[in-house]
Regions:
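Conserved beta-sheet core of the metallophosphoesterase superfamily
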Residues: 196-269
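A short C-terminal boundary segment appended to hydrolase-like catalytic domains
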Residues: 1, 265-296
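N-terminal active-site segment of His-dependent metallophosphoesterases
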Residues: 1-80
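Active-site neighborhood of phospho(di)ester-bond hydrolases with catalytic His/Asp-centered motifs
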Residues: 9-11, 64-69, 95-102, 148, ...
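Extended active-site neighborhood of metal-dependent phosphoesterases/phosphodiesterases
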Residues: 81-169, 212, 235-238, 262
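Active-site environment of divalent metal-dependent phosphoester hydrolases
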Residues: 14-17, 73-76, 102-110, 152-156, ...
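Beta-strand-turn-beta hairpins that frame and shape the catalytic cleft
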Residues: 1-8, 135-146, 175-183, 233-240, ...
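Internal alpha/beta domain cores that form substrate/cofactor-binding pockets in large enzymes
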Residues: 40-53, 60, 74-96, 193-195, ...
Length: 296
């Protein structure tokens, strides 16, 4: 019997510290974001927390790591090289898959920097000469399907959007993969449901219709900076959608401290067995196991 495949999931590192910004870089939405960072966010997004979380994750020796966006904060040019160095420290491109978040496409001027900087971490197995969404990467029994919900938005908005072209391509991919023997994991930054108008995935209804028609085994997302488990309709059974807190965060108000998920995936008869272990920053004792849940 083969050992279970172990997939780690972290999100929203918002890599600190924010580099020095030139005045000309802080026009429009970035001015709001820079003010928010200097007054507030720098207090609870900590590099030492992020490094401790990644170190603990690597000690678990996962077979693959999924990172669901928001590596940077304001998408300043000066943020991308440090983010690339950090991601290389998490693992090589064959062992880590990443999709962008809204902060990675914060403004139109640098919306394409994420793909150019991290292309080898989000390139599909059959599209090695190009980078586009959706993409598919097969790792053991797992098929990672990456989509991008990252689009520039006006100030005070953090919505996501997939668009007709990406949804159409995803429809084709999911239809084909429904006939394949794979544990399908959809990676997207935004949650599939949100009560907040300013933070929602605007075409989530179309995505949910595709999932109901074709199915996947698991959805992983970030964005909300909280522990989250939601269940959505699939063709035969409910689909779990799992969110995770920011990987660099201290606890504040209703936002929990940094955590990551570790999924153990293996065949169970004609189906799949998937168990989730949550590890994160405890109150006094560093990174520890917070809970275990069987999802299927």
């Amino acid at each position: 019997m083969m050992a279970a495949f172990r997939l780690a999931h972290l999100s929203d590192p918002h890599l600190p510290p924010l580099p020095a910004a030139r005045l000309r870089d802080l026009a429009g939405k970035r001015a709001f974001g820079y003010l928010n960072w200097t007054r507030n966010r720098h207090k609870y997004h900590r590099r030492d927390v992020l490094d401790a979380l990644v170190s603990d994750m690597q000690a678990q020796q996962p077979d693959h790591v999924a990172v669901t966006g928001d590596l940077v904060n304001l998408a300043l040019d000066a943020e991308f090289n440090p983010a690339r160095q950090w991601l290389e420290g998490v693992g090589g491109a064959a062992d880590v898959t990443v999709v962008p978040g809204n902060h990675d496409a914060y403004v139109r001027a640098t919306r394409h920097r994420f793909v150019s900087m991290f292309g080898d971490y989000l390139r599909g197995d059959t599209d090695r000469a190009a980078t586009h969404f959706p993409f598919v990467r097969r790792r053991g029994p797992v098929a990672l399907i990456g989509v991008s919900s990252a689009v520039p938005t006006p100030p005070l908005m953090a919505t996501g959007w997939l668009g007709h072209a990406q949804l159409g391509a995803l429809d084709t991919i999911l239809a084909r993969m429904s006939r394949e023997d794979a544990f399908r994991v959809l990676l997207v930054h935004h949650p599939l449901h949100s009560d907040g108008h300013a933070k929602r995935l605007t075409d989530s209804h179309q995505l949910l219709a595709l999932l109901k028609r074709h199915g996947v085994e698991l959805v992983l997302h970030g964005h909300d900076h909280i522990h989250s488990t939601m269940w959505f309709d699939g063709p035969e059974r409910k689909i779990p959608a799992i969110g995770v807190p920011s990987a660099s965060a201290l606890a504040r108000k209703h936002y929990p401290a940094a955590a990551y998920n570790l999924f153990s995936i293996e065949r169970d008869g004609n189906g799949w067995r998937c168990e989730q272990t949550v590890r994160g920053l405890g109150d006094r004792d560093g990174i520890r196991e917070l809970k275990q849940v069987r999802l299927s």
